[in-house]
């Protein structure tokens, strides 16, 4: 199986600008390629894992990645289908860019990676040059046909967001001309921007050897967006989402989804994935595929040490049937792996659920209590006025809050 065929088998290729040329380039040559990450937030999410896996697979094949962090495009914002993006300040955009670059460097550790920030060149273009030299080369009708733009026409789209496509096209041209990048990689939602970049290179350089690939949008089996838990977006930054929450998310992936996730989100070889697929069909209760998926992802985005902490946390939470069975050393680890709220005073359960992010609001917290889904250790709490005090603690310090079977948090006095 060729490298291109492996990418197809892994469901990592949705669109190709020229399949014959892309296949030849990836299978028989060494190519410099780029993938962009806009710093719209302070952290990557697990939704970025599709692109990261693709980068790692390309590296393993000997191809050379250029990672573009969009310090400039992050100031503009790629058009959303539903609403106008809130503009970031220059300071926030550059801070986010630095944070995301740091995360990517940790994930792509010991790999040959070149990092660039498009603020370096896009900030140097004055408005007259932008309109005369580049705006002239973009057809409005073509831009209006792009999916995200077309979706927004009825409600309205600003010229700022409308111009995003031109800026991303300029990125591809700059990297093609100055860094010898021939291939752009992006999600399927970026396909319109990728093809616009190819067209700009053709017009400015009179060449047609630049190429583009898009990866599919990864959805859960119910059609919802991949990478969100009950609490919201799963961030790579451990201070924004605990590694244990990500561990739990992937450990509970359904049998319908797990094999596709193994293909698209890990570097596990084909034969091993096929064996895991067979085991899932014959012995689904063992959940070997889910365990392999979880272990690979936590090790990739965090570390093998953090993986062991997550495994140990799971053992502690699911092996202690009674409050008295916990040991004090268990809580030393739980403070590292669960979301914790520290307090010196009694706290209403409703407030504690919000503070520990087990509920998004007091009204939601009350609904959870009414539905009998809230426990202190393993005792169900049914009173809306219940207050957590030192009397509820273990070792005069710790209270374990549970919502349902899988969501846990810690109150520390």
Swiss-Prot record:
BP terms from Gene Ontology? tyrosyl-tRNA aminoacylation
Catalyzed chemical reaction(s): tRNA(Tyr) + L-tyrosine + ATP = L-tyrosyl-tRNA(Tyr) + AMP + diphosphate + H(+)
Family matches, as InterPro entries? aa-tRNA-synth_Ic, Rossmann-like_a/b/a_fold, S4_RNA-bd_sf, SYY-like_C, Tyr-tRNA-ligase, Tyr-tRNA-ligase_bac-type, Tyr-tRNA-ligase_bac_1
First-listed, main subcellular location of the protein, grouped into a coarse class: cytoplasm
Q: Which domain of life is it from?
A: Bacteria
From the record, which residues define motif 'HIGH' region? 39-48
The function of this protein is: Catalyzes the attachment of tyrosine to tRNA(Tyr) in a two-step reaction: tyrosine is first activated by ATP to form Tyr-AMP and then transferred to the acceptor end of tRNA(Tyr).
Q: What is this protein called?
A: Tyrosine--tRNA ligase
Residues that bind L-tyrosine, according to the entry? 34, 164, 168
- Tell me which residues bind ATP: 228
Please tell me one Gene Ontology term that the record gives under cellular component. cytosol
Ranges for domain S4 RNA-binding come to 347-413
- Which organism does this record belong to? Onion yellows phytoplasma (strain OY-M)
Listed PANTHER family: TYROSINE--TRNA LIGASE, MITOCHONDRIAL (PTHR11766:SF0), TYROSYL-TRNA SYNTHETASE (PTHR11766)
One Pfam family assigned to this protein is tRNA-synt_1b
Q: What residue ranges carry the coiled-coil annotation? A: none
Q: Which GO terms describe its molecular function?
A: ATP binding; RNA binding; tyrosine-tRNA ligase activity
What family is this protein classified in?
A: Belongs to the class-I aminoacyl-tRNA synthetase family. TyrS type 1 subfamily.
